[in-house]
């Protein structure tokens, strides 16, 4: 079977330590979250079922004519990601709901980044899906991890292990780093 994370220990500063198949590793919490969300969004884009959270104050955005048209064309996919959007005309949209794990202050940036991803031709469906999932994961992982409890750390690590890829974040950055006895010897001199 695949190696399991055990003995999680939150380190603060957005990191946690754990054993991975007997090796001592440090995990970047934000990148781990991005990997988990990325896999979740890829699945969602496949079957279109995301949870939307209603915003207390809808966010009004003014788009260019092209962006507005692109958004209208892809309205169904935006909805499947968990966006609740009203088209007010004149290039104005009102975002009334966002995906459940999206920080509210990331909404406008998210919409613009997603429009970039959606401008990938539909003929490149897989690439397009991956780009969209990567944008969503980046947005969702933005919230700075506060200090985690041991249980939260354990839950995050088991979700990470379930993705089958705990080496790299969607943007290709390392999620885990092994700390070897040599590293420790060097540090302690």
What are these regions (language model features)?
Residues 2-189:
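Long, charged low-complexity intrinsically disordered regions
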């Amino acid at each position: 079977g695949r190696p399991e994370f055990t003995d999680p220990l939150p380190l603060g500063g957005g990191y946690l330590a754990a054993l991975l198949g007997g090796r001592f590793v440090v995990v970047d919490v934000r990148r781990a979250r991005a990997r988990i969300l990325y896999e979740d969004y890829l699945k969602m884009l496949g079957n279109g079922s995301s949870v939307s959270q209603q915003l207390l104050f809808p966010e009004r955005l003014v788009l260019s004519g092209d962006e507005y048209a692109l958004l209208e064309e892809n309205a169904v996919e935006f909805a499947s990601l968990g966006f609740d959007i009203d088209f007010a005309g004149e290039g104005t949209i009102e975002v009334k709901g966002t995906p459940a794990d999206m920080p509210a202050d990331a909404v406008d940036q998210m919409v613009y980044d997603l429009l970039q991803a959606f401008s990938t031709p539909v003929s490149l469906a897989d690439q397009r899906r991956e780009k969209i999932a990567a944008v969503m994961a980046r947005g969702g992982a933005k919230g700075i991890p506060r200090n985690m409890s041991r249980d939260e750390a354990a839950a995050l690590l088991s979700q990470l292990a379930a993705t089958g890829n705990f080496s790299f974040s969607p943007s290709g950055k390392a999620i885990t780093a092994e700390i070897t006895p040599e590293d420790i010897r060097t540090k302690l001199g």
